[in-house]
Amino acid sequence: MYYTEEEVLEYVKEEDVKFIRLAYFDLSGKQKNATIMASELPRAFEDGISFDASAIKGFEDPNKSDLFLFPEASTLSVLPWRPSAGKVIRMFCSIRYPDGKPYKKDCRYLLKTAVEKIKNECGLELHFGTEFEFYLFKLDENGLPTKIPFDNATYMDLAPEDKGENIRRNICFTLEQMGITPVASHHEEGPGQNEVDFRYSDALTTADNASTFKWIVRTKAAESGLYADFSPKPIQDKPGSGMHINISSSDDSKNENILAGILSHIEEITYFLNPTENSYNRLGELKAPRYICWGKENRSAILRVPASKGNLRLELRSPDSTCNPYLAFTLLIHAAIDGIKQNLKAPPATNKNLFDAKIAKSSSYKTIPDTLDEAKNCAENSDFIKGILGEL
Protein backbone atom coordinates (compact mmCIF):
# COMPACT_ATOMS: atom_id res chain seq x y z
CA MET A 1 0.00 0.00 0.00
CA TYR A 2 1.27 3.48 -0.90
CA TYR A 3 1.15 6.13 1.84
CA THR A 4 1.58 9.90 1.63
CA GLU A 5 3.22 11.94 4.40
CA GLU A 6 -0.19 13.28 5.42
CA GLU A 7 -1.61 9.76 5.65
CA VAL A 8 1.32 8.60 7.77
CA LEU A 9 0.90 11.51 10.18
CA GLU A 10 -2.82 10.73 10.47
CA TYR A 11 -2.09 7.03 11.01
CA VAL A 12 0.41 7.82 13.76
CA LYS A 13 -2.18 9.97 15.52
CA GLU A 14 -5.11 7.57 15.18
CA GLU A 15 -3.21 4.34 15.98
CA ASP A 16 -1.32 5.60 19.04
CA VAL A 17 2.09 5.14 17.43
CA LYS A 18 4.79 6.18 19.89
CA PHE A 19 8.07 5.32 18.19
CA ILE A 20 9.31 5.78 14.63
CA ARG A 21 12.29 3.79 13.37
CA LEU A 22 14.18 5.52 10.60
CA ALA A 23 16.04 2.82 8.66
CA TYR A 24 18.96 3.19 6.26
CA PHE A 25 21.95 1.13 5.12
CA ASP A 26 25.72 1.27 5.16
CA LEU A 27 27.69 0.26 2.08
CA SER A 28 27.81 -3.39 3.12
CA GLY A 29 24.02 -3.46 3.16
CA LYS A 30 23.74 -3.65 6.94
CA GLN A 31 20.55 -2.03 8.15
CA LYS A 32 20.92 0.84 10.61
CA ASN A 33 18.24 2.81 12.35
CA ALA A 34 17.53 5.82 14.52
CA THR A 35 14.38 5.91 16.64
CA ILE A 36 12.45 9.13 17.13
CA MET A 37 9.31 9.90 19.07
CA ALA A 38 6.09 10.34 17.14
CA SER A 39 6.05 14.06 17.92
CA GLU A 40 9.27 14.47 15.89
CA LEU A 41 7.89 12.95 12.70
CA PRO A 42 6.66 16.23 11.11
CA ARG A 43 10.17 17.66 11.54
CA ALA A 44 11.70 14.51 10.07
CA PHE A 45 9.55 14.82 6.95
CA GLU A 46 10.31 18.54 6.60
CA ASP A 47 13.94 18.96 7.68
CA GLY A 48 15.32 15.46 8.16
CA ILE A 49 16.99 13.96 11.22
CA SER A 50 20.75 14.45 11.47
CA PHE A 51 23.24 11.70 12.28
CA ASP A 52 27.01 11.30 12.52
CA ALA A 53 28.02 9.73 9.22
CA SER A 54 31.65 9.42 10.31
CA ALA A 55 30.60 6.54 12.59
CA ILE A 56 29.08 4.50 9.73
CA LYS A 57 31.17 1.96 7.84
CA GLY A 58 31.95 3.25 4.37
CA PHE A 59 30.64 6.75 5.14
CA GLU A 60 33.64 7.86 7.21
CA ASP A 61 34.55 11.47 6.47
CA PRO A 62 35.02 13.63 9.59
CA ASN A 63 35.07 16.76 7.42
CA LYS A 64 31.56 16.04 6.12
CA SER A 65 30.03 14.03 8.92
CA ASP A 66 26.61 15.68 9.12
CA LEU A 67 24.03 13.88 7.03
CA PHE A 68 20.24 13.82 7.28
CA LEU A 69 17.64 11.04 7.19
CA PHE A 70 14.39 11.78 5.36
CA PRO A 71 11.74 9.08 5.91
CA GLU A 72 9.89 7.88 2.80
CA ALA A 73 6.20 7.68 3.67
CA SER A 74 5.49 5.02 1.04
CA THR A 75 7.67 2.50 2.91
CA LEU A 76 5.66 2.54 6.16
CA SER A 77 5.34 -0.77 7.97
CA VAL A 78 4.27 -1.68 11.50
CA LEU A 79 6.58 -3.87 13.58
CA PRO A 80 4.16 -6.67 14.54
CA TRP A 81 6.30 -8.12 17.32
CA ARG A 82 6.22 -4.89 19.34
CA PRO A 83 3.39 -4.17 21.85
CA SER A 84 0.09 -3.08 20.28
CA ALA A 85 -0.16 -0.28 22.84
CA GLY A 86 2.34 2.37 21.81
CA LYS A 87 2.98 0.94 18.35
CA VAL A 88 6.31 1.08 16.57
CA ILE A 89 6.50 1.79 12.85
CA ARG A 90 9.45 1.78 10.48
CA MET A 91 10.20 3.71 7.33
CA PHE A 92 13.18 3.51 5.02
CA CYS A 93 14.98 6.80 4.53
CA SER A 94 16.79 8.70 1.84
CA ILE A 95 20.11 10.18 2.96
CA ARG A 96 20.92 13.77 2.06
CA TYR A 97 23.66 16.33 2.50
CA PRO A 98 22.86 19.45 4.58
CA ASP A 99 22.04 21.32 1.34
CA GLY A 100 19.37 18.73 0.51
CA LYS A 101 21.21 16.96 -2.30
CA PRO A 102 21.20 13.13 -2.32
CA TYR A 103 24.15 11.51 -0.56
CA LYS A 104 26.34 9.81 -3.18
CA LYS A 105 26.90 6.72 -0.99
CA ASP A 106 23.22 6.12 -0.27
CA CYS A 107 22.80 2.69 -1.88
CA ARG A 108 19.02 3.12 -2.16
CA TYR A 109 19.61 6.34 -4.12
CA LEU A 110 22.04 4.52 -6.44
CA LEU A 111 19.38 1.89 -7.14
CA LYS A 112 16.68 4.51 -7.74
CA THR A 113 19.00 6.19 -10.25
CA ALA A 114 19.57 2.89 -12.08
CA VAL A 115 15.83 2.20 -12.23
CA GLU A 116 15.20 5.63 -13.75
CA LYS A 117 18.05 5.17 -16.22
CA ILE A 118 16.78 1.91 -17.72
CA LYS A 119 13.26 3.34 -17.87
CA ASN A 120 14.32 6.57 -19.60
CA GLU A 121 16.98 5.14 -21.90
CA CYS A 122 15.59 1.69 -22.69
CA GLY A 123 11.87 2.14 -22.09
CA LEU A 124 11.45 -0.80 -19.75
CA GLU A 125 11.31 -1.90 -16.13
CA LEU A 126 13.01 -4.88 -14.54
CA HIS A 127 11.36 -6.90 -11.80
CA PHE A 128 13.45 -8.72 -9.22
CA GLY A 129 12.84 -11.67 -6.94
CA THR A 130 15.13 -13.32 -4.40
CA GLU A 131 15.42 -16.84 -3.00
CA PHE A 132 17.09 -16.92 0.42
CA GLU A 133 18.61 -20.00 2.04
CA PHE A 134 19.69 -19.99 5.68
CA TYR A 135 20.66 -22.36 8.47
CA LEU A 136 19.12 -22.58 11.94
CA PHE A 137 21.72 -23.37 14.60
CA LYS A 138 21.40 -24.11 18.30
CA LEU A 139 22.82 -21.79 20.96
CA ASP A 140 25.28 -22.81 23.66
CA GLU A 141 24.75 -22.39 27.42
CA ASN A 142 25.92 -18.78 27.15
CA GLY A 143 23.44 -17.95 24.42
CA LEU A 144 26.08 -17.85 21.70
CA PRO A 145 25.55 -19.51 18.30
CA THR A 146 27.06 -22.92 17.62
CA LYS A 147 27.42 -24.87 14.39
CA ILE A 148 25.01 -27.54 15.65
CA PRO A 149 22.02 -27.66 13.25
CA PHE A 150 18.50 -27.46 14.66
CA ASP A 151 17.60 -30.69 12.85
CA ASN A 152 19.00 -33.33 10.50
CA ALA A 153 16.27 -33.17 7.88
CA THR A 154 16.96 -33.05 4.13
CA TYR A 155 15.29 -31.51 1.09
CA MET A 156 11.55 -30.96 1.55
CA ASP A 157 11.27 -33.38 4.48
CA LEU A 158 8.26 -33.26 6.79
CA ALA A 159 7.92 -33.00 10.55
CA PRO A 160 9.08 -34.51 12.84
CA GLU A 161 12.36 -34.68 10.87
CA ASP A 162 11.84 -31.07 9.79
CA LYS A 163 11.89 -29.04 13.01
CA GLY A 164 11.91 -25.68 11.24
CA GLU A 165 8.33 -25.90 10.01
CA ASN A 166 6.80 -23.76 12.76
CA ILE A 167 9.54 -21.14 12.53
CA ARG A 168 9.03 -20.83 8.77
CA ARG A 169 5.29 -20.54 9.44
CA ASN A 170 5.89 -17.66 11.87
CA ILE A 171 8.22 -16.01 9.38
CA CYS A 172 5.53 -16.17 6.68
CA PHE A 173 2.88 -14.71 9.00
CA THR A 174 5.20 -11.86 9.97
CA LEU A 175 6.08 -11.14 6.35
CA GLU A 176 2.36 -10.77 5.59
CA GLN A 177 1.88 -8.45 8.55
CA MET A 178 4.65 -6.21 7.20
CA GLY A 179 3.20 -6.08 3.70
CA ILE A 180 5.45 -8.70 2.08
CA THR A 181 3.76 -11.61 0.29
CA PRO A 182 5.35 -15.03 1.00
CA VAL A 183 4.88 -17.59 -1.77
CA ALA A 184 6.62 -20.78 -0.60
CA SER A 185 8.81 -22.28 2.11
CA HIS A 186 10.51 -25.62 2.67
CA HIS A 187 13.40 -27.43 4.29
CA GLU A 188 16.53 -27.33 2.15
CA GLU A 189 19.18 -30.02 1.54
CA GLY A 190 21.47 -29.24 4.46
CA PRO A 191 20.73 -30.14 8.11
CA GLY A 192 18.92 -27.20 9.66
CA GLN A 193 18.84 -25.42 6.29
CA ASN A 194 15.67 -23.63 5.20
CA GLU A 195 14.29 -21.54 2.36
CA VAL A 196 11.46 -19.01 2.33
CA ASP A 197 10.51 -17.20 -0.89
CA PHE A 198 8.43 -14.06 -1.27
CA ARG A 199 6.79 -12.38 -4.27
CA TYR A 200 8.86 -10.48 -6.79
CA SER A 201 8.43 -6.72 -7.29
CA ASP A 202 10.21 -3.69 -8.68
CA ALA A 203 13.93 -3.43 -7.90
CA LEU A 204 13.73 -1.01 -4.95
CA THR A 205 10.81 -2.75 -3.26
CA THR A 206 12.49 -6.15 -3.61
CA ALA A 207 15.74 -4.82 -2.13
CA ASP A 208 13.79 -3.30 0.77
CA ASN A 209 11.91 -6.57 1.24
CA ALA A 210 15.12 -8.59 1.15
CA SER A 211 16.59 -6.52 3.97
CA THR A 212 13.37 -6.77 5.96
CA PHE A 213 13.24 -10.53 5.37
CA LYS A 214 16.67 -11.16 6.90
CA TRP A 215 15.73 -9.05 9.91
CA ILE A 216 12.47 -10.98 10.38
CA VAL A 217 14.19 -14.37 10.09
CA ARG A 218 16.84 -13.47 12.66
CA THR A 219 14.20 -12.07 15.01
CA LYS A 220 11.94 -15.13 14.78
CA ALA A 221 14.88 -17.50 15.17
CA ALA A 222 16.02 -15.64 18.29
CA GLU A 223 12.50 -15.85 19.73
CA SER A 224 12.79 -19.65 19.37
CA GLY A 225 16.20 -19.76 21.06
CA LEU A 226 18.04 -20.30 17.77
CA TYR A 227 20.48 -18.47 15.52
CA ALA A 228 19.69 -17.82 11.85
CA ASP A 229 22.90 -18.02 9.83
CA PHE A 230 22.89 -16.50 6.33
CA SER A 231 26.60 -17.04 5.68
CA PRO A 232 27.38 -18.70 2.32
CA LYS A 233 29.18 -21.76 3.72
CA PRO A 234 28.63 -22.21 7.47
CA ILE A 235 29.47 -25.95 7.44
CA GLN A 236 32.30 -26.94 5.14
CA ASP A 237 31.04 -30.34 3.93
CA LYS A 238 27.35 -29.36 3.71
CA PRO A 239 25.40 -27.38 1.10
CA GLY A 240 26.03 -23.65 1.04
CA SER A 241 23.36 -20.97 1.25
CA GLY A 242 22.73 -18.70 -1.71
CA MET A 243 20.54 -15.76 -2.58
CA HIS A 244 19.42 -16.51 -6.12
CA ILE A 245 18.30 -13.40 -7.97
CA ASN A 246 15.43 -13.68 -10.46
CA ILE A 247 15.05 -11.00 -13.12
CA SER A 248 12.19 -10.42 -15.54
CA SER A 249 11.59 -7.60 -17.99
CA SER A 250 8.52 -5.64 -19.00
CA ASP A 251 9.69 -6.29 -22.59
CA ASP A 252 10.53 -9.94 -23.30
CA SER A 253 12.11 -8.98 -26.63
CA LYS A 254 15.06 -7.55 -24.67
CA ASN A 255 15.72 -10.69 -22.61
CA GLU A 256 18.59 -11.91 -24.78
CA ASN A 257 20.32 -8.51 -24.56
CA ILE A 258 19.83 -8.46 -20.78
CA LEU A 259 21.18 -11.98 -20.40
CA ALA A 260 24.20 -11.19 -22.58
CA GLY A 261 24.87 -7.95 -20.72
CA ILE A 262 24.92 -9.69 -17.36
CA LEU A 263 27.20 -12.47 -18.62
CA SER A 264 29.59 -9.91 -20.11
CA HIS A 265 29.99 -8.09 -16.78
CA ILE A 266 29.59 -10.91 -14.26
CA GLU A 267 33.33 -11.11 -13.47
CA GLU A 268 33.43 -7.42 -12.51
CA ILE A 269 30.18 -7.62 -10.56
CA THR A 270 31.13 -10.74 -8.57
CA TYR A 271 32.86 -8.72 -5.83
CA PHE A 272 29.48 -7.15 -5.04
CA LEU A 273 27.49 -10.39 -5.35
CA ASN A 274 29.92 -12.41 -3.22
CA PRO A 275 31.65 -9.89 -0.93
CA THR A 276 33.17 -12.13 1.78
CA GLU A 277 35.94 -14.71 1.90
CA ASN A 278 33.37 -17.29 2.98
CA SER A 279 31.49 -16.65 -0.27
CA TYR A 280 34.22 -18.41 -2.24
CA ASN A 281 34.04 -21.53 -0.08
CA ARG A 282 30.54 -22.02 -1.48
CA LEU A 283 31.11 -21.32 -5.17
CA GLY A 284 31.92 -24.31 -7.32
CA GLU A 285 30.67 -26.83 -4.76
CA LEU A 286 27.36 -28.59 -4.19
CA LYS A 287 25.15 -26.80 -6.73
CA ALA A 288 26.81 -23.37 -6.46
CA PRO A 289 27.88 -22.51 -10.04
CA ARG A 290 31.02 -20.66 -11.06
CA TYR A 291 31.23 -21.13 -14.83
CA ILE A 292 30.21 -18.12 -16.92
CA CYS A 293 27.50 -19.51 -19.17
CA TRP A 294 23.76 -19.89 -19.34
CA GLY A 295 21.36 -22.76 -19.84
CA LYS A 296 17.70 -23.61 -20.06
CA GLU A 297 16.68 -25.16 -16.74
CA ASN A 298 20.39 -25.96 -16.15
CA ARG A 299 21.24 -25.36 -12.50
CA SER A 300 24.96 -25.83 -13.11
CA ALA A 301 25.06 -22.68 -15.28
CA ILE A 302 25.62 -19.38 -13.49
CA LEU A 303 22.59 -17.92 -15.27
CA ARG A 304 19.61 -20.05 -16.23
CA VAL A 305 16.18 -19.66 -17.77
CA PRO A 306 13.77 -21.70 -15.62
CA ALA A 307 10.81 -23.49 -17.16
CA SER A 308 7.82 -21.16 -16.96
CA LYS A 309 4.30 -20.79 -18.37
CA GLY A 310 4.31 -17.02 -17.87
CA ASN A 311 6.83 -14.31 -18.66
CA LEU A 312 10.40 -15.49 -19.08
CA ARG A 313 12.75 -14.85 -16.21
CA LEU A 314 16.46 -15.15 -15.65
CA GLU A 315 17.86 -16.75 -12.51
CA LEU A 316 21.33 -15.67 -11.43
CA ARG A 317 22.59 -18.43 -9.13
CA SER A 318 25.96 -17.20 -7.86
CA PRO A 319 24.97 -14.43 -5.37
CA ASP A 320 24.75 -15.03 -1.63
CA SER A 321 23.07 -13.27 1.27
CA THR A 322 26.17 -11.35 2.36
CA CYS A 323 25.73 -9.04 -0.63
CA ASN A 324 24.16 -5.60 -0.47
CA PRO A 325 20.99 -6.11 -2.57
CA TYR A 326 20.82 -2.43 -3.48
CA LEU A 327 24.30 -2.42 -5.00
CA ALA A 328 23.79 -5.87 -6.55
CA PHE A 329 20.56 -4.82 -8.28
CA THR A 330 22.11 -1.48 -9.32
CA LEU A 331 24.99 -3.20 -11.11
CA LEU A 332 22.76 -5.82 -12.71
CA ILE A 333 20.48 -3.11 -14.10
CA HIS A 334 23.46 -1.27 -15.57
CA ALA A 335 24.72 -4.53 -17.08
CA ALA A 336 21.28 -5.00 -18.64
CA ILE A 337 21.38 -1.45 -20.03
CA ASP A 338 24.78 -2.14 -21.56
CA GLY A 339 23.49 -5.33 -23.14
CA ILE A 340 20.49 -3.53 -24.64
CA LYS A 341 22.40 -0.49 -25.91
CA GLN A 342 25.13 -2.60 -27.50
CA ASN A 343 22.58 -5.13 -28.77
CA LEU A 344 24.67 -7.93 -27.27
CA LYS A 345 23.78 -11.47 -28.27
CA ALA A 346 23.82 -14.40 -25.90
CA PRO A 347 26.25 -17.26 -26.54
CA PRO A 348 24.74 -20.72 -27.14
CA ALA A 349 23.04 -22.27 -24.12
CA THR A 350 24.79 -25.16 -22.41
CA ASN A 351 23.18 -28.44 -21.43
CA LYS A 352 26.36 -29.78 -19.82
CA ASN A 353 26.41 -30.75 -16.16
CA LEU A 354 29.16 -28.43 -14.98
CA PHE A 355 28.90 -29.80 -11.44
CA ASP A 356 30.71 -32.85 -12.86
CA ALA A 357 34.40 -32.04 -12.41
CA LYS A 358 35.52 -33.93 -15.53
CA ILE A 359 32.93 -32.27 -17.74
CA ALA A 360 33.69 -28.84 -16.28
CA LYS A 361 37.44 -29.16 -16.80
CA SER A 362 36.96 -30.20 -20.41
CA SER A 363 34.75 -27.17 -21.13
CA SER A 364 36.03 -23.86 -22.48
CA TYR A 365 33.94 -21.67 -20.18
CA LYS A 366 35.61 -18.96 -18.14
CA THR A 367 34.96 -18.83 -14.40
CA ILE A 368 34.13 -16.02 -12.05
CA PRO A 369 36.96 -15.06 -9.64
CA ASP A 370 38.13 -17.87 -7.33
CA THR A 371 38.90 -15.68 -4.30
CA LEU A 372 37.77 -12.44 -2.71
CA ASP A 373 41.09 -10.79 -3.59
CA GLU A 374 40.68 -11.74 -7.25
CA ALA A 375 37.12 -10.42 -7.28
CA LYS A 376 38.16 -7.16 -5.61
CA ASN A 377 41.01 -6.65 -8.06
CA CYS A 378 38.67 -7.29 -10.97
CA ALA A 379 36.18 -4.72 -9.67
CA GLU A 380 38.84 -2.11 -8.89
CA ASN A 381 40.17 -2.32 -12.45
CA SER A 382 36.75 -2.14 -14.07
CA ASP A 383 35.76 1.01 -15.93
CA PHE A 384 32.20 -0.34 -15.88
CA ILE A 385 32.14 -0.38 -12.05
CA LYS A 386 33.89 2.98 -11.71
CA GLY A 387 31.41 4.58 -14.07
CA ILE A 388 28.52 3.51 -11.85
CA LEU A 389 29.86 3.57 -8.29
CA GLY A 390 32.78 5.97 -8.61
CA GLU A 391 35.28 5.46 -5.81
CA LEU A 392 32.96 3.77 -3.31
Spans of features found by a protein language model:
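Glycine-rich, acidic/polar active-site loops that bind/position phosphate-bearing ligands
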Residues: M1-L392
